[in-house]
């Protein structure tokens, strides 16, 4: 999709599968997740003659979830794999699906609305299919991806993982019980 997008004219359906700008200062207040490797969340593409948005590495451009065609393709991909017998999906980097000026671009209401639609779709067509949210957030933010039982059925608890190692190293349960108390 990206090769097609970068070779298509501005404003075309193909180009709009990704988030592009002429101004790399757009969303300037959004944190850069991998600061050791990326100087910006925007990377110049010499073919498209525009900057494309990536929340992680420059070789991982973000899809434009505001584009209904992108959403349609996601539904088709889910259907394809469910028809092949897959009954669970890890939804990677789920807090970062949408971009909104004036926000930190994390945990936005649009993300939850999309997840509700996707969950309703699989519940109707493929009952028993599960979604695992990969949301590297503090527990109170990550828990929101359960919705009211209408988003993801499971969720990683990222803060507990490094604390397990810390507890072993310190020979103390406190790092684990502390994060669960939060």
Model feature map: region roles:
Residues 88-90, 128-132, 153-155:
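Structural preference for beta-strand elements that scaffold enzyme active sites
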Residues 1-75, 79, 83, 94-149, ...:
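Acidic/aromatic-lined carbohydrate-recognition and catalytic surfaces
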Residues 135-182:
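Noncatalytic carbohydrate-binding groove/subsite architecture in carbohydrate-active enzymes
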